[in-house]
């Protein structure tokens, strides 16, 4: 069995029958111009490490880049993504005149849930206020 993951002009190929990969690459090369970058290490914000037990996925570089982007690289980490039983209030705080920063930040954190499902509840709470976020919501998101 072979798997192809295609994103725009990038293709990741893998499968449990490694001898089929060169044949597939040769067939694709006959139709398209290809550049083989070797074993997969990084793809769409995911770090991929191959071990004897399989593939290990991580987003540590993506998370570091996000912290750098929002100027929080030296922030103290929290033990949990949000306080248990906490709920955000729609009208708490003043509405943001440009909600783009909040929406972008929540989108970036949402992407982290691929490898950090423990963030899902907190992200779901933040997503409820995408249309009219307040300054309090932005602080909580950070």
Predicted regions and their residues:
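Long, low-complexity, charge-biased intrinsically disordered regions
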Residues: 1-142
């Amino acid at each position: 069995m072979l798997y192809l993951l295609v994103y725009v002009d990038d293709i990741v190929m893998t499968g449990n029958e490694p001898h089929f990969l060169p044949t597939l690459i040769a067939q694709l090369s006959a139709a398209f111009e290809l550049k083989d970058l070797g074993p997969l290490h990084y793809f769409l914000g995911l770090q991929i490490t191959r071990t004897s037990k399989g593939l290990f996925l991580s987003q540590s570089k993506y998370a570091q880049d996000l912290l750098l982007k929002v100027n929080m690289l030296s922030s103290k980490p929290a033990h949990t993504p949000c306080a248990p039983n906490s709920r955000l209030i729609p009208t708490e705080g003043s509405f943001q005149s440009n909600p783009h920063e909040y929406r972008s930040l929540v989108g970036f954190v949402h992407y982290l849930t691929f490898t950090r499902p423990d963030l899902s509840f907190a992200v779901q709470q933040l997503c409820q206020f995408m249309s009219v976020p307040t300054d309090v919501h932005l602080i909580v998101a950070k």
